[in-house]
Amino acid sequence: MTETFHCLNDAVVTRGDYARLIDVNIHCEERPVWDVRADGVIVSTPTGSTAYSMAAGGPVVSPETDCFVVTSICPHSLIDRSIVFPSSKALYVKVQNDVDNNSIFTADGKRPVQIDGRTVVRISKSPYVARLIKVKPDNFYEILRKKIIER
């Protein structure tokens, strides 16, 4: 069964109810890139980079940057870094060791979907564009400084 979700901020694959790590495989197009043992992974847009991804240690990305950021959630590793991919590439996320149908996929935190080790989550740039109305002009770097750096 194939379902399509659209999100503005992030797509998350995470462990379910059990307090155990999951093994997640990340592919970019057909190429294996990263295997991580963690509570899960966050794939964020630049808009979502200042939310869950940042809280998990991911970078803050300028909204003009056309990319995805993959950040692991509580990885079982002393050395772990986020990876930035161009949004022109499709990413594939698969939970390797979940046979209990206990992992969860969410897009922007909406309607959690249970997934298992046979499920491959494909993440790609949506053909839809979000059009936002600005009440006043903003400067990303000034807002970043005020909200995050000066806290």
Enumerate the language-model features and the residues they cover.
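Catalytic phosphate-donor-binding core of small-molecule kinases
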Residues: 1-39, 50-151
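Single, functionally critical "micro-switch" positions that shape active/binding sites
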Residues: 47
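AMP-binding/adenylate-forming core of the ANL superfamily
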Residues: 40-44
